[in-house]
Amino acid sequence: MVVSVGFVMGIIRSIGFAAGLGLLVCSAPAVDVRRGPWGELELLPVMLSPMNEVLPDGTATVYATEWYFPGHTTSSLVAFLSGVSLSAAQQASLLDPEVWSRDAAGVIGVRPAETVVLSLSPESRARLYAELAGSPANQRYYQPWSIRTNVMNALLAGSELTPEIQAQIRRVAYLRGDRYLVSDFPVLLNATTDAGQKIRLLRLRNASSGYDVQLRVPSGGSIDALVAYWGVMGREGRIRPYLDAMCRTTGDMQMDITHLLPVFARTRLNTFPKMVVGDAMVRDCHWSSLNFFNTVPDDTFARLTGMQQEIRHNYVKIDGEPGFGDLMFFTGTDGHIIHSAVYLAANLVFTKNGHEATHPWVI
């Protein structure tokens, strides 16, 4: 699942159509059933957190927060900050010339006091951070940590963070759609001197949300439609025997859709990349998306030129509803492509957020 300040820019389809395990830190009751040409899917929200050895060593780091406002003049920024429902004390602090700066390009930067960051109201935080999210220079706001609202309580309950820190997380979280976003982990890390709590915060910050997805296979029913949907790209012969065996049992059966994915996705789903010293390959969302149907990953997709060539020669844009294996692009408000993913079914995608070893492959 992709969450960003953007929207789906386009869907393209391959013209072939005619890792160490992460730690599952929490789950929530299955609340979502989705039916369609893919069959009947049951979704269980889960969170994956990397093991401590792949986390950045941030226990002794003092983090700085600076907001950048490209496109703003002094007067327009003053007007904006005066219009986001700040308290008099917050407004005075953020408008203090001592916390303002300009870079060589004239972009205004503001260094907010951490007390101001922690005290923002949900309304002010959402409006202010939506503005910051318009620029990649504000990376934590442009691509914030996010979690579905129905998973937040379970995640914090299993986090082993103190009640005080849990309350701070709730205070700095802001809503966008059905997700909570958090951009202020650096402020939270600075607020505690407990090394153990810092490590737990780092694990939480690097946790990724996803779904465990089960397909209900009706007993004695026809599997032709399921084979047609999940068996694209010449995979019907692999999919049919498995589904056929499931439907011959007594009573409806459920199967993890991992078994229906190509080998690349099947062997990586809900795992973290292996760390290899000296390996500079950028195996990110684009590399993962373009290798979805490959048995042996093609590292030319880790380079922009290789990715562009593959899309230009082997994909076509489609305007209708996406189907299994279609490639989806997500853009920022400036039109810049910030993410890609592979459509599976029921508005679910297979993806990897970033190339880092702390980011798993998820649905």
Where are these regions (language model features)?
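N-terminal capping segments
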Residues: 31-301
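Detector for intrinsically disordered, low-structure N-terminal pre-sequences
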Residues: 1-7, 24
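Bacterial N-terminal signal peptides
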Residues: 15-25
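...with weaker cross-activation on analogous glycine-rich loops/strands in unrelated enzymes
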Residues: 299-358
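Aromatic- and glycine-rich peptidoglycan recognition patches
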Residues: 32-54, 315-316, 344-363
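Sec/Tat signal peptide C-region and signal peptidase I cleavage site
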Residues: 26-30
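Bacterial N-terminal signal peptides that target proteins for export
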Residues: 5-16
